[in-house]
Amino acid sequence: MNVVVDNLLTHYEMTGQGKVVLLLHGWGDNLMGLSSIQKSLAKKYTVVSLDLPGFGATQAPTTVWNLDNYAYFTEAFLAKLDLKPYAVVGHSNGGALAIRAIAMQLLNPTKLVLLAASGIRDGQTAKRLGLNIIAKVGNAATFWLPKTTRGKLRKKLYGAVGSDLLVVENLQETFKQTVRQDVQADAAQLVLPTLLIYSDADTAVPIKDGHSYNKLIKNSRLEVINGASHFVHLDQPLRVDSLIQEFLA
């Protein structure tokens, strides 16, 4: 399905019936990255998942954006569809977006689920910004390969620093603004019940970020998955689904 939000053609999916659950994907991903969660939750809830601007089938913004812009866009998207989420599930940068939007009072869910949420900017930020250099090197080193092979190899190159933080073409400046925006002060404002799910083997967003958010968000609970990647919901779908279902009930 498609809808025009803030002059951007926006692709989304809405399935199931019941209370509304909003899914927010991470940087470089799209709504398909959370499809397993959508399918599971749709048995009990109305699940809404969208491609954020610049990703999937949604048009890219024409100016440089940061988390605030994405937060305002998310509010406008929900208003357009007249939806009031009971819960928000955010993965990686989608988690940082959820934290920021709730702190700005643009979202007002009853419950929040953060899957390997980013948004804590420490010494690793410079490393992540280095993706711009990796992107340039990747382009130069793989231009001669077939397009499908080229894309896979570049993703491996980017994945060396964190696959969720891929530098999408034409969004490099937006990427820079996003990874510079720390949401720890926003997290400290949150009081709603929050489930944190992190992996102890995540190389993109370290487990210490989960512990930090657990301390910052007063009414939060941290669940640690052993041995999973940054895409913990794909590596351990049954475990993650069980945790989310129990938390939202």
Task: Locate each region found by the language model.
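Catalytic histidine-centered segment of alpha/beta-hydrolase-like enzymes
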Residues: 228-241
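Flexible "cap/lid" loop of the alpha/beta hydrolase fold
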Residues: 99-104, 109-143
